[in-house]
Amino acid sequence: MTKEKIVLAYSGGLDTSVAVKWLQDKYNYDVIAVALDVGEGKDLDFVKKKALDVGAIKSYVIDAKNLFAEEYVLPALQANLLYEGKYPLISALSRPLISKILVDIAEEEGAVAVAHGCTGKGNDQVRFDVSFTALNPNLKIVAPVREWAMSREEEIEYAKSHGIPIPINLDSPYSIDQNLWGRSNECGILEDPWAEAPKDAYDLTIDPVDAPEDPEVIQITFKKGKPVSIDGKEMPLDELILQLNTIAGKHGVGRIDHVENRLVGIKSREIYEAPAATTLIAAHQELEALTLPREVAEFKPTIEQKLAQTVYYGLWYSPLTEALQSFIEKTQEHVSGTVKVKLYKGHAQVIGRESENSLYDFDLATYNKADAFDHDAALGFIKLWGLPTQVHSAVNGPQGKKSIEKVDLEVKEAVKP
C-alpha cells in the first residue's frame, strides 16, 4: 500500500532531523524534506544529503535569496517596517515564503500534509499554520515539536537510538534564526532582561566600542523605493543587502536589544542584528522625506505601523496585508535618488540626500537674498488657519483660562540708565 506523503520544512538541525523519523513512526508518512537558503549561508548540499540520510524519501534544496529579497524584504523596506518601532521582522518575513514553497511542492508531489519544526510557544507556529491554511486549506498541518512533548534530553536519546547525527553546536545556550535581513537570538542568559547580552550573542556586528575610529561614508541609490547600488556599483538586491551587512556590521551598526510582545501573549527578550536593514531603512526614510508630499508623508506611518503588526502576526496572505501593501507601493513611484550615510560606532547617520523628484525648493526654503517665498501671503494664511480657534474662543471663552490660572507677576519697569 502506498504511503501518504508529507512535506517538511527542513533546516538540518536536530529538531527537524528527529521530525523526519518521528513522522514516519507516528503517522507512517513518506517524508519529503525542503530546505531553503534565504541568506543564512546554508551548505545546501550537506543539508540535502543529511535529509536523505535520516530517512526522507526526497530532499529539495532551494536557493531562495533573490526571491526572498525581491518579494518579501523589499515591500518591508518600502514600508519601513519595524514591529513596535524596533524589530525589522527578520524571521516574520521568511515564514510566508517558506510556507508558499512548501505548499507548491506539496501540490506538485501529491502530498496530503505539510509540517514545520516550531514549538508551541513561539510566533512562528502561527505564521506557518495561518499561511498554510490561506494557501491551501485542504492540506493537513503537523507540528512534531509541538506534538511530541519530548524534553531536550529525550529528544537526544531518540536521535541516538535512531542513528540521527547530533549537531556539534547543540550545547549552545542560544536559539538563533538568520536570513539576509538579519539575525535573531534568544534563550540562555538573554532571557534575563536585566543582563547585558554577552559578546558571543552577536555575530554579524562588531561591538561599537571596538569599531573603527574612522567613519565610513557610503552612497545608496534607490529607484522607486528599491536600493539598486552602493557607491555607484549596481547589484541584485540580495547581494546588495548581504554586502551592506558586512559594510555596516564592521561599524557595529544594527544591534537591537528588544523586549517585545509576542503574538501568543507573552513578552520575550530578543537580541537582533540587522546592519543592512537598519542602514537601508534610515536611508529610505530620509529619501521619502525629500520626495513625498506632506500629506502622504504624515499618513504613511499609520499604514506602516498596521502593516508591521499584520506581518508579525502571520497575516502576510490576508486581504488587509494586500490592501496595505497596495498603498505602500503607490507611494514609492517618485522615491528615487541617492542618500549619503555615515557609518560610525553603531550609528548609521544620513548626512546627505538628492533626487530628481525632490520637493525641496531651495529658493523657497532659503533665508538669503534669493528667497522667493511670498511673505505677504503668510498673513492671510495665518488668519484663515487660526479662524476656527478664534471663533471657538469668541463663543466659549479663551482656552487659556481653562488650563492656566492667572497669576500675579512682579513687573519691573525697564529704565534706561
From Swiss-Prot:
Alphabetized InterPro entries for the sequence: Arginosuc_syn_C, Arginosuc_syn_N, Arginosuc_synth, Arginosuc_synth_CS, Arginosuc_synth_type_1_subfam, AS_cat/multimer_dom_body, Rossmann-like_a/b/a_fold
PROSITE patterns reported for this sequence: ARGININOSUCCIN_SYN_1 (PS00564), ARGININOSUCCIN_SYN_2 (PS00565)
Gene3D superfamilies named in the record: Argininosuccinate synthetase, chain A, domain 2, HUPs, Single helix bin
Residues given in the record as L-aspartate binding sites: T119, N123, D124
Tree of life domain: Bacteria
Binding positions (ATP): A9, Y10, S11, G12, G13, L14, D15, T16, S17, G117
Catalytic activity field: L-citrulline + L-aspartate + ATP = 2-(N(omega)-L-arginino)succinate + AMP + diphosphate + H(+)
Binding site for L-citrulline: Y87, N123, R127, S175, S184, E260, Y272
Pathway: Amino-acid biosynthesis; L-arginine biosynthesis; L-arginine from L-ornithine and carbamoyl phosphate: step 2/3
Compartment annotation: Cytoplasm
Gene Ontology terms: cellular component: cytoplasm
EC identifiers of the protein: 6.3.4.5
Keywords: Amino-acid biosynthesis, Arginine biosynthesis, ATP-binding, Cytoplasm, Ligase, Nucleotide-binding
One Pfam family matching this protein: Arginosuc_synth
Gene Ontology MF terms in the entry: argininosuccinate synthase activity; ATP binding
GO biological process: argininosuccinate metabolic process; L-arginine biosynthetic process; urea cycle
Family note: Belongs to the argininosuccinate synthase family. Type 1 subfamily.
Subunit annotation: Homotetramer.
Protein name stated in the entry: Argininosuccinate synthase
Originating species: Oceanobacillus iheyensis (strain DSM 14371 / CIP 107618 / JCM 11309 / KCTC 3954 / HTE831)
